Each structure stands twice: as C-alpha cells, then as structure tokens.
C-alpha cells in the first residue's frame, strides 16, 4: 500500500494533474490497483460541466495511465524515469464519473519489450465499469 506522498516518489505528476490518491495493491512490473477520490473541488469541474459535473473521459484514461506507470516505474531499473502515453486501443467509456465517486483503477501489464510496454486497464465505480482500455507506453 502507498499513500499519495509515496506515489509522488514514483511518478512525476503533481497537482492538478496527479490523478492517483493511493495504491492499495502492487505487484512490481505486473499489476497495480489504485484509488482516485473524485472531489467536487477538482479544477476540471469548473468547465466540464458547471451544471452537470462529469469527470472527462480522457482524465479517467490518464488516471489509468498513471496507475500503469506506477507498476513499471517502481522497478529498480526504471526508478527516476518517466512513462509516456504512446497509444490507446479498445477504449470504452461505460459509466459517468461524478463528484463523490471513488475510482478503482486496475492495470495489468500484459507486455514489455525494452522501453515499450502495454497494459490493460479497467476503471470502476462501485463495481461498475467506467472505462476500459489497452494502454501503450514508452519509458524514457
């Protein structure tokens, strides 16, 4: 388990773009489960949408990418490096995410070849799938 301060030691993201609050389970280089508490105070809710606040789908996807980055950047040989989003496949948004929701973020690394890898991510709220995608990343 990692709190947000420990997460910040692994990935370079910071407010307002750090989208992982806590890691609840990690298998280095293989699998990570993390949480994002979605607050009404998130800066994106000011414009998306003031009368009907919904977390932008691309930010749910980014939260999954950050979760996957934790899995691979926590490996000793990758510490201090940065993970870059290189591609997205089979992405589907199935549920809106609103203030007060807790995103459960699960990413399993399904392939690594040198600095390029792919992860399968699923974001859920109360057991319902909000987003699923295959995420390709590059480590530099």
Swiss-Prot record:
EC number: 4.2.1.59
Compartment(s): Cytoplasm
Catalytic-site annotation from UniProt: 48
Enzyme class per UniProt: lyase
HAMAP family: FabZ
Keyword tags: Cytoplasm, Lipid A biosynthesis, Lipid biosynthesis, Lipid metabolism, Lyase
Lineage: Bacteria, Bacillati, Bacillota, Bacilli, Bacillales
Keyword Lyase: yes
Name of the protein in its database record: 3-hydroxyacyl-[acyl-carrier-protein] dehydratase FabZ
GO biological process, alphabetically ordered: fatty acid biosynthetic process; lipid A biosynthetic process
GO molecular function: (3R)-hydroxyacyl-[acyl-carrier-protein] dehydratase activity
